[in-house]
């Protein structure tokens, strides 16, 4: 038997070991928090500040506003064009989005499934695909305008830009509005029906007022996205130019960072103003729809019973869905068709061309997307936990900063990274790291929101109970929080992968010529008029993303079935 002295010695040794482990765990916890907050300041706030500082730099190195006057004189028309297109695009896109969302929320059976599939394909497709399909369908030699209607129209104008931007913004807006509609209180709709209200009255007096804040959010987001879009005006704008397109040409053609920074300020300032309006509207929307129903139930409303408003929305959404089907059908077919004297035949020559010049870029795109998906998801989970549960000082400020990239134009965020990380001690330009960091923090707002929503389902009492039983902060994070965030991990992974495969605006200035990505091969092919190759690249990107999303769906469904079988 051990002596009392030996037992006491072992106890003291174990106690000192526990104290040392606790100190190390607390230090690691503080280090994680410091890295999270420092990364947000470094990779979000600092690039934005660099744009503002560079735009105010005068010829003598002092502070000067002269560059803003130069921009207004030289690019005043482009600025007016941007506002013109933004307003029309925002209104048209919001009307189409609201119509499509109501159709999706009220449809039944296979109709609802079909609408959701079309929306999903449109959401995960790469940029520039709308412009590509627009040229092939409605161009001077378009399938519809020329071959079917025998018309030779000039599609390169402002109205083409407005139409394509509006259609490309609808899927994301409509899915957002569908989520809001699914949260409406069924009791309010049922009470109105019991009191004799018609479908049209319920839609006009209950549904539309409840989703008005969310509708205004779509309006703001569409306007900001239109301001930031450079690809559509460059490809189908013709002589019509916008400020975002001029920024792209200014950086790529002249490398004038001072002027491009000043030009970006005209996009950055309204975006930041709209950002705070967006946050206020989202809080109001949450108050109107929070005490509602589960997302799996159907909206108890039928649009055909809603009078002229309902039928009008059905007509608009039908036009939208038909255009989307035509658009993607055209793109998928064009990659395997060859025209000879007006006769089309099946061919694989573009596939061989893609394999020769684009296989490495496609693999690199997948590699980057996987890295950003894993790293970005872990970062978002940690950031959401520390902001939501730890209640640190300045939490509101850091949460606001982390959400800011959601509203920033891609060109602003990209040029900000060039200015911020183009010199010692943190020179990242020309490396893959700057591209990965830009992708990660551009997608951080949505990833954090997904994780925060999952955290809301985890009672804080479980964390407190674990702490009361002696678990350290990191042990609680590892054994309690992370397992509860497993569904959020998969959702964030899919979102980050999809966004990384299809992003263009924020990283177009950061890509090294030796490290091209597939989405920029697509842009080059469209810009150079190689539409068949562009169609094939777009199809491959879309199929890769859909495969990843399908795999994630199967994993989620298998996990749900396993939990049901256990119960």
Show which residues each predicted segment covers.
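A short amphipathic helical element positioned immediately N-terminal to and/or at the very start
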Residues: 63-72, 346-355
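Membrane-water interface segments at the C-terminal ends of transmembrane alpha-helices
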Residues: 28-59, 71-182, 210-231, 262-280, ...
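Glycine-rich helix-loop "coupling/hinge" segments at transmembrane-helix boundaries
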Residues: 230-254, 339-343, 504-531, 565-567
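Transmembrane alpha-helical segments of polytopic membrane transport and secretion proteins
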Residues: 1-35, 280-318, 551-567
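Juxtamembrane inter-helical linkers in multi-pass membrane proteins
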Residues: 198, 286-303, 340-354
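Helix-loop-helix hairpin linking two adjacent transmembrane segments in secondary transporters
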Residues: 245-270
